From Swiss-Prot:
This is Aspartate 1-decarboxylase. Pathway: Cofactor biosynthesis; (R)-pantothenate biosynthesis; beta-alanine from L-aspartate: step 1/1. The active site is at residues 25, 58. Is synthesized initially as an inactive proenzyme, which is activated by self-cleavage at a specific serine bond to produce a beta-subunit with a hydroxyl group at its C-terminus and an alpha-subunit with a pyruvoyl group at its N-terminus. The modification Pyruvic acid (Ser) is found at residue 25. It is an enzyme of class 4 (lyase). One of its GO terms (cellular component) is cytosol. Its main location: cytoplasm. It catalyses: L-aspartate + H(+) = beta-alanine + CO2. GO terms for molecular function: aspartate 1-decarboxylase activity. Heterooctamer of four alpha and four beta subunits. Catalyzes the pyruvoyl-dependent decarboxylation of aspartate to produce beta-alanine.
């Protein structure tokens, strides 16, 4: 049996921008992508701590060490600059493997989205 489990989580990161006119996605600082094992184009779920919105989009790479977290396209309507969000991705795996699987968990500094 296959089940879906949390693979990666960037917990409580601050939105730095919202670009309604971009074609879609979420731009994430490359350092955060690498630390969380999320790849460009991967589907991610977003939970907005400030307003309770939950939605999905896909990740694109932002500049390294920029702290950028920008929601693009229609998703830009779901956030405001300064909102705190959680970014999660999931993976399917065998039920037995899932019992011991450990997700990548990242806890950035909410002030500048750094890992310091």
């Amino acid at each position: 049996m296959q089940i879906e489990v949390v693979k990666s989580k960037i917990h409580r990161v601050t939105v730095t921008g919202a670009d309604l006119n971009y074609i879609g996605s979420i731009t994430i600082d490359e350092v955060l992508l690498e630390a969380s094992n999320i790849i460009e184009g991967e589907k991610v779920n977003i939970v907005n701590i400030n307003n309770g919105e939950r939605f999905e989009t896909y990740a694109i790479k932002g500049a390294k060490n920029s702290g950028e977290i920008t929601l693009n396209g229609p998703a830009a309507r779901k956030v405001h600059k300064g909102d705190i969000i959680i970014i999660m991705s999931y993976a399917r795996m065998d039920f037995e493997k899932a019992k011991t699987f450990k997700p990548w968990l990242v806890f950035p500094n909410e002030k500048d989205n750094s890992l310091k």
